[in-house]
Amino acid sequence: MKAKNSKKTITDSTVDQDVLTYTVGEDTILDKALIKWDCMGTAAHVTMLSEIKGLKRPIVTKKESALVRKELARVVSLAEKGAFTIREDDQDVHMAVERALTERLGDLGKKIHTGRSRNDQVAVDVRLHIKSEILSLEKELCALSAALCSFGAKAGAVPLVGRTHLQPAMPSTVEMWATGHAEMVLDQLENFEAAYRLADLNPLGSAAGYGVPLPLDRSRTTELLGFSRTIHNCFGASMARGECEASFLSALAQLMCVLSRLAEDMIIFSMPEFAYFRLPREYCTGSSIMPQKYNPDVLELVRGKTAQVVGWQTAALTLLHAMPGGYNRDLQDAKLLYMKGLETVRTTLRILAKLVAGMTVDADACRAAFSPGVFATDVALRKVAAGVPWRDAYHDVRDHLEMLESEDADAAVKAKSHEGTCLGIDLGIYLKRISDATALAEKRLDALEGCCRKLLR
């Protein structure tokens, strides 16, 4: 006898309502981001099934394949309008799409899962989604780096006290500070490229991790979906679930750490005690009690959200660390973790790019911050130029710090012209990296979208 508090799913199993809600989790919401990619994966799979030769009877004919692909294109169109629903009894996007196709195409819709498991289905969906999102994030990352370069170029050689241990150290410039952060942001492309390469592998056809007794052409779906290669071992394809999510989260967490340091510098340098930079008022909030306050809440939240993303990365790694071979339901949560990290990083990059674009420099405040001690190393090096050994020059200055005098900060920074220092910053290097990375991301996105358009027509 069926329990009153139960529901029948598309797989014909009757599940207690509380169990269904607990196991489905947030998938009915999260999987909205995967509808397009699930349809793309299904289109590739059905196309491949229609091309299998040597069977007594085709699993799917070419005509049927075309009908399925047309219906999948309709599902994507509905999803783009917000009109495609993933129900709780669907459990996920895969069963929702199968239900929709079965409702429209009858028995033909029931054929699309042949030779597949939801294990390799979700793995394909997630990898296609991560590939697309990495490329979009790379463009956002480049936009922030460009904003920092523009900010630095406008300030040019405005002197800025360089700091170590947060203490005054040596003469620097605003441009050096800004482009230094721009370079750190750009360097994060390496981490995203590593995550992209890992995601760019096709698990489709591995089914539940052990293959199927059908002559599936896995290389064909790799070609149709635009992956660089197939994950050869079916068990290995199953084991790789969660790995690309964790790798993506690692890149996201590392980037957030870089952005958090940028945010901290901007908080400090915009304090009244420093006042080197002025943050745009629209990015600051007031106080409910102190009328004079303009707080850098946005930048403080960048620091706070960094803790969140690092936490999600740690959660993903912990999820995997003692998991037995083969699929385990724990892996469902890897999707939630990377999607949260993705959205946090995307919004952070966008708001920081706008904030940097609206930030201004107080050149007088920057120059006024130079104390005699900031020039100590320069004084010692002038002694070296006069023939004094470095260590003797160092101790001579160290022993007579009270004799140091203020110097012209502008002249001090102009004395540094070798590669990468105050007057040795080549903006062209950064602009070329930004241009090349943006162009490559757009080219890859166009190729991925091209695969999608070809399959869903």
Give the location of each predicted region.
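Glycine-rich cofactor/substrate-binding loops
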Residues: 2-41, 107-108, 275, 290-457
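Short linear loop/turn motifs
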Residues: 66-70, 235-240, 396-400, 434
